[in-house]
UniProtKB/Swiss-Prot annotation:
Post-translational modification: Ubiquitinated by the Cul9-RING ubiquitin-protein ligase complex, leading to its degradation. Ubiquitination is required for centrosomal targeting. Deubiquitinated by USP35 or USP38; leading to stabilization.
Binding of Zn(2+), residues: C57, C60, H77, C84
Highest rank taxon of the organism: Eukaryota
Name of the featured protein: Baculoviral IAP repeat-containing protein 5
Entry-linked Gene3D superfamilies: Inhibitor Of Apoptosis Protein (2mihbC-IAP-1), Chain A
Gene Ontology annotations for the cellular component aspect, listed alphabetically: centriole; chromosome passenger complex; chromosome, centromeric region; cytoplasm; cytoplasmic microtubule; cytosol; interphase microtubule organizing center; kinetochore
Gene: BIRC5
Residue numbers carrying Phosphothreonine: T34, T48, T117
Function: Multitasking protein that has dual roles in promoting cell proliferation and preventing apoptosis. Component of a chromosome passage protein complex (CPC) which is essential for chromosome alignment and segregation during mitosis and cytokinesis. Acts as an important regulator of the localization of this complex; directs CPC movement to different locations from the inner centromere during prometaphase to midbody during cytokinesis and participates in the organization of the center spindle by associating with polymerized microtubules.
Subunit description: Monomer or homodimer. Exists as a homodimer in the apo state and as a monomer in the CPC-bound state. The monomer protects cells against apoptosis more efficiently than the dimer. Only the dimeric form is capable of enhancing tubulin stability in cells. When phosphorylated, interacts with LAMTOR5/HBXIP; the resulting complex binds pro-CASP9, as well as active CASP9, but much less efficiently.
Family in the record: Belongs to the IAP family.
InterPro entries: Baculoviral_IAP, BIR_rpt
Source species taxonomy: Eukaryota, Metazoa, Chordata, Craniata, Vertebrata
GO molecular function, one term: zinc ion binding
Length: 142
């Protein structure tokens, strides 16, 4: 079974697939945070206009930017997301049993749901703040 036949989220378990996301990555040879080392630490490159070096762990969804050439991706990952289960996996994706993989992917799915829920809550709170402000302005105008 080829990597392309895997669901997109599962393709990210393959280091080569993660490496392929590092197009226009500013740190190449002579740096600690090369695309290969970033992918080894679980990161994918997801740049934005304002954050060209934004990288996100595909597993815990922690986003880090402001990379320096000497930053060690695994150490930075541990420092900012020490509970990421991906960091404790000692086998390659292809070596995991089905049971091990499904248990691991269940953790990734829980992380994704938590991240999305947190984002929606922030969005709701921002909207509620704007609505409250508009209501207060209406009340003050009376």
């Amino acid at each position: 079974m080829g990597a392309s036949s895997l669901p997109p989220a599962w393709q990210l378990y393959l280091k080569d697939h993660r490496v392929s996301t590092f197009k226009n990555w500013p740190f190449l040879e002579g740096c600690a945070c090369t695309p290969d080392r970033m992918a080894e630490a679980g990161f994918i490159h997801c740049p934005t206009e304002n954050e060209p070096d934004l990288a996100q762990c595909f597993f815990c969804f922690k986003e880090l930017e402001g990379w320096e050439p000497d930053d060690d991706p695994i150490e930075e990952h541990k420092k900012h997301s020490s509970g990421c289960a991906f960091l404790s996996v000692k086998k390659q994706f292809e070596e995991l049993t089905l049971s091990e993989f499904l248990k691991l992917d269940k953790e990734r799915a829980k992380n994704k749901i938590a991240k999305e829920t947190n984002n929606k809550q922030k969005e709701f709170e921002e909207t509620a703040k704007k609505v409250r402000c508009a209501i207060e302005q209406l009340a003050a105008a009376e």
